[in-house]
Amino acid sequence: HNDAELSRLVSRGLVTIDKDDLEEMIDAEGEVLLIRAHGEPPRTYDKAHTLGFEIIDCTCPVVLKLQESIRKAYEKHEEKGQGQIIIFGKIGHAEVLGLIGQTDGAAIVVENTLMLDEFIADGTIDLGVHTEVFSQTTKSPAEYAILCAGLEERMEGPLNIHDTICSQVATRHDRLSKFALEHDIIIFVAGKASSNGKVLCDLCKSLNIRTYHIDSTSEVKREWFR
């Protein structure tokens, strides 16, 4: 989400593609495919290998570990013929798409407690089967705890809740809360498309109304400091 770094890489020949572009390719022998930190579903790797790409996998190690945990949980459910995987995350987020891919699309993504209630009411979530719960690595620990508590109150079948939020993200919440209260103005620098940046900036703003989200110095306004 660093626009300046992306621009630098583009100037050096980087071309950004999505899954549709990849599907349309016929041959990529000798080309290099860089997988971003959010990770990708297994089908992306399969297609890239088939096309002949050399793959440089830059998936975050924390995300890789989470992908493996979800894949193993899903495989166990498949062996037993029952069970469900719930992922607390943002629908459509790149990391979440990669996580869903570990379950052949079977995982249920829940964004908030309202959605949880809806999925329980309409039967999307089965309260009677073995359930494994994971979180996108950059979500709010407090929100995840609330969602898990809601499941614990209602689940009838076995329930396993996994602590999969990145420890760096989790500890930042406490430090940022203290930081936001100790300063008059918060200038929060992060890419505007970053889910992690938005979560952390919103945390600051909830404690200090004079919090401003920017991704370049050109956005800083003089009136903020009056």
Regions found by a protein language model. Give the residues of each.
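The feature marks the mature, well-folded catalytic cores of soluble enzymes
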Residues: 1-226
